[in-house]
UniProtKB/Swiss-Prot annotation:
Organism taxonomic ancestry: Bacteria, Pseudomonadati, Pseudomonadota, Alphaproteobacteria, Hyphomicrobiales
Required cofactor names: Zn(2+)
InterPro entries: aa-tRNA-synth_II/BPL/LPL
Function: Catalyzes the ATP-dependent activation of L-glycine and its transfer to the phosphopantetheine prosthetic group covalently attached to the vicinal carrier protein blr6284 of yet unknown function. May participate in nonribosomal peptide synthesis or related processes. L-alanine is a poor substrate whereas L-serine or D-amino acids are not substrates for ATP-dependent activation. Does not display tRNA aminoacylation activity.
Binding residues annotated for an L-alpha-amino acid, in chain numbering: E176
Note: Lacks the N-terminal tRNA-binding domain compared to class-II aminoacyl-tRNA synthetases.
Stated name of the protein: Amino acid--[acyl-carrier-protein] ligase 2
């Protein structure tokens, strides 16, 4: 779920207005770091309603898991993320040591120094994707049955990609459906979801296209991995033209990992071979931004079919809409 966006040089004139900037005040609260925002009630309500639509499309016999925003560092290292995307990883650090050592760090801060020199890494990292904590859990259950396993997972995720663009957050929500089983089983799962996800996007009133894609692997070796990923059709994305047709935003992705996680974690299928895995990922914040950019900030004016799908009751004539309530509150606070 990544899209390269060119940033203006640091010494350039202020960048021109981005096509999504008009949404910022209605949807987000600045928190002092690019891509990290507080979220308004108007925005969160739509995120939750999109999540409900996705849940209604969940396949039978799918196990639901919800993960915290952090995961075990050793598990992420074993999964291979550090080798593929080291530049995107966020590691949890803390002030460890005896009282005098911690006091020294505080004293350094009081004196105007850099207290972070005393930080050392914990055994946790910020989760870069919702599915990574799943694989060691699945591995602990023994062989995968012939019918395979299907999971619905979600997490608050983090990738160190500071950006002023509202469709590239550092802290974001990801929802995934993950399939573990034989190569044929997980390939069929991905094909079903490519079709199903397009219907969801159409029902949401979004303009989109499906295209081959690759992850932003790090370094020169990563460039070769990206070419291979594309050539083997291991990744597709559902792209929404929020800025233009030439610079679309990936709001969903459809990924086939082959036996990478099966081999890494010792997950075997019913035949005793390394299990294959696939996932469909929904960028919940990108989908919500796409909805507001497509249909406007006042949900009362969204197409009736979209409102019905999301369960938005028709606004009574004369009653203020959620956006009008937000606008009044904004004006009262200014």
């Amino acid at each position: 779920m990544n899209l390269a966006i060119v940033e203006a040089p640091a010494d350039s004139t202020p960048p021109p207005a981005d096509p999504l900037d008009h949404l910022a005040d209605a949807l987000f609260h600045e928190m002092g770091s690019p891509g990290v925002y507080g979220r308004t009630a108007l925005y969160e309500d739509v995120v939750e309603r999109i999540a409900a639509v996705i849940s209604r499309n969940r396949e039978p016999n799918t196990e639901v898991m919800r993960f915290p925003p952090v995961m075990n560092r050793a598990q992420l290292e074993r999964s291979g993320y550090l080798k593929s995307f080291p530049n995107l990883l966020g590691c949890v650090c803390g002030l460890h040591g005896i009282e005098s050592e911690i006091d020294a760090a505080i004293s350094r801060f009081d004196a105007g120094g850099d207290w972070t020199e005393s930080l050392s890494p914990a055994d946790l990292v910020l989760s870069p994707a919702a599915c990574y904590p799943l694989y060691p859990i699945a591995a602990s259950r023994g062989p995968v049955p012939a019918a395979g396993w299907s999971f619905d997972v979600a997490a608050d995720c983090f990738r160190r990609e500071p950006s002023r663009h509202l469709d590239r957050l550092q802290s974001f929500r990801m929802r995934e459906f993950v399939c573990i089983g034989s190569a044929d089983h997980v390939s069929a799962f991905r094909e079903r979801w490519i079709i199903r996800a397009q219907k969801i996007a159409r029902d949401l009133g979004l303009t989109f296209r499906i295209d081959h894609a690759n992850d932003p692997f790090f370094g020169r070796v990563g460039q070769m991995m990206a070419v291979s990923q594309k050539q083997l059709s291991l990744k597709f994305e559902l792209l929404v033209p929020l800025r233009s047709e030439e610079r679309p935003t990936a709001c969903m992705s459809f990924n086939y990992h082959r036996d990478h996680f099966g081999t890494t974690w010792g997950i075997v299928d019913a035949a005793g071979e390394p299990a294959h895995t696939a996932c469909v990922a929904f960028g919940m914040d990108r989908l919500a931004v796409a909805m507001f950019h497509t249909h406007g900030k006042d949900v009362a004016l969204w197409p009736i079919a979209v409102r019905d799908l999301l369960g938005l009751a028709q606004t009574d004539r004369g009653a203020p809409s959620a956006f009008e309530e937000y606008r009044c509150a904004k004006e009262a606070g200014s």
